[in-house]
Amino acid sequence: MSFTPKNLNVKYTFNVSRNRSKVWLISGFAVLISFLGFFFSWTNQSIGFPLRPGFDFTGGTQIILERKCDSECNKITTINISEAFNNAKFSNQETSQKLFDARIQFLDGYKSLLIRSPELSPSESKEVIESIEFVAGPLEDGGQSVESIGPTLGAKLLQTTLISLLVAFSCVAIYISIRFDRMFSLYALLALFHDVLIVCGVFSWLGIINEVEVNSLFAVALLTIAGYSVNDTVVVFDRIREINKQESRMNFKQKVDFAVSATLTRTLYTSGTTLLPLIALIFFGGTTLYWFAIALALGVVVGSWSSIALVPSLLTLRKEN
């Protein structure tokens, strides 16, 4: 089925070639902000990495407690919890030292507490929970969760995650290189790098401002974003290639503009329907899936932008065959 215009006086929904400098400015600014986020995160003494690593990668012990409250839970502060740790008589003196740098976070309107510290033994974790209960009040039956990951296992998981990301992106690069010519492949890979970089940059800033951490779920989100981005880009490339073969009256810039206009509605509809369940996860998916859904939603938006704006705008630099 041909989608080429019957005449050359076609009105483009979005004229990429005319607005390409604006597209480059927007993407360039987003990439610059992302690199700044990496820099400030790396130089931050409390982080020391481009992204704030989560419990999965750093190891340690994570304790989640749910308080028993009739309606609203009374407000307590991290100072109250720290004082409880200082006043507690732990059987092991090293426990107090481990809790000195513990991260304390309140969830669900002070109904739940999250404590993250260097690795604790089961007996130490039990004593920590008892000391918190003295300040926070009674806890829900079964509302206690204790997880421990050794630093060696955490480092191994981080290494495995990075390798899996590298392998996945390499496979995508090979697929694109086989499917399209060299120039198309280069721009598609650039778009993939652009999408992943910006999502990571946003989470870098979130780690600095809001102490948001990245974990293994974030790596899954990046892999999903890569696949989604490539799929959208391939659709636009296929339309450009089809028009390039069938329409000889148009120059290459016109072909790119028409291909973008022809796929714009499809891309927006696909992105919109993909965002709907992600929005539901953001509001109703709980704390575990919250940032995972945020990362995916951001990736869908950025991926759509690169597919219908950034890559086609770069293709307009290509000379006529």
From Swiss-Prot:
<protein>
    <recommendedName>
        <fullName>Protein translocase subunit SecF</fullName>
    </recommendedName>
</protein>
<dbReference type="GO" id="GO:0065002">
    <property type="term" value="P:intracellular protein transmembrane transport"/>
</dbReference>
<feature type="transmembrane region" description="Helical">
    <location>
        <begin position="217"/>
        <end position="237"/>
    </location>
</feature>
<feature type="transmembrane region" description="Helical">
    <location>
        <begin position="23"/>
        <end position="43"/>
    </location>
</feature>
<comment type="function">
    <text>Probably participates in protein translocation into and across both the cytoplasmic and thylakoid membranes in cyanobacterial cells.</text>
</comment>
<comment type="function">
    <text>Part of the Sec protein translocase complex. Interacts with the SecYEG preprotein conducting channel. SecDF uses the proton motive force (PMF) to complete protein translocation after the ATP-dependent function of SecA.</text>
</comment>
<dbReference type="InterPro" id="IPR022645">
    <property type="entry name" value="SecD/SecF_bac"/>
</dbReference>
<feature type="transmembrane region" description="Helical">
    <location>
        <begin position="290"/>
        <end position="312"/>
    </location>
</feature>
<feature type="transmembrane region" description="Helical">
    <location>
        <begin position="258"/>
        <end position="280"/>
    </location>
</feature>
<dbReference type="GO" id="GO:0043952">
    <property type="term" value="P:protein transport by the Sec complex"/>
</dbReference>
<keyword id="KW-0811">Translocation</keyword>
<keyword id="KW-0997">Cell inner membrane</keyword>
<dbReference type="Pfam" id="PF02355">
    <property type="entry name" value="SecD_SecF_C"/>
</dbReference>
<feature type="transmembrane region" description="Helical">
    <location>
        <begin position="189"/>
        <end position="209"/>
    </location>
</feature>
<keyword id="KW-0472">Membrane</keyword>
<keyword id="KW-0812">Transmembrane</keyword>
<dbReference type="InterPro" id="IPR005665">
    <property type="entry name" value="SecF_bac"/>
</dbReference>
<dbReference type="GO" id="GO:0015450">
    <property type="term" value="F:protein-transporting ATPase activity"/>
</dbReference>
<keyword id="KW-1003">Cell membrane</keyword>
<dbReference type="InterPro" id="IPR022813">
    <property type="entry name" value="SecD/SecF_arch_bac"/>
</dbReference>
<feature type="transmembrane region" description="Helical">
    <location>
        <begin position="158"/>
        <end position="178"/>
    </location>
</feature>
<keyword id="KW-0813">Transport</keyword>
<dbReference type="InterPro" id="IPR048634">
    <property type="entry name" value="SecD_SecF_C"/>
</dbReference>
<keyword id="KW-0653">Protein transport</keyword>
<dbReference type="GO" id="GO:0005886">
    <property type="term" value="C:plasma membrane"/>
</dbReference>
<keyword id="KW-1133">Transmembrane helix</keyword>
<comment type="similarity">
    <text>Belongs to the SecD/SecF family. SecF subfamily.</text>
</comment>
<dbReference type="GO" id="GO:0006605">
    <property type="term" value="P:protein targeting"/>
</dbReference>
<comment type="subunit">
    <text>Forms a complex with SecD. Part of the essential Sec protein translocation apparatus which comprises SecA, SecYEG and auxiliary proteins SecDF. Other proteins may also be involved.</text>
</comment>
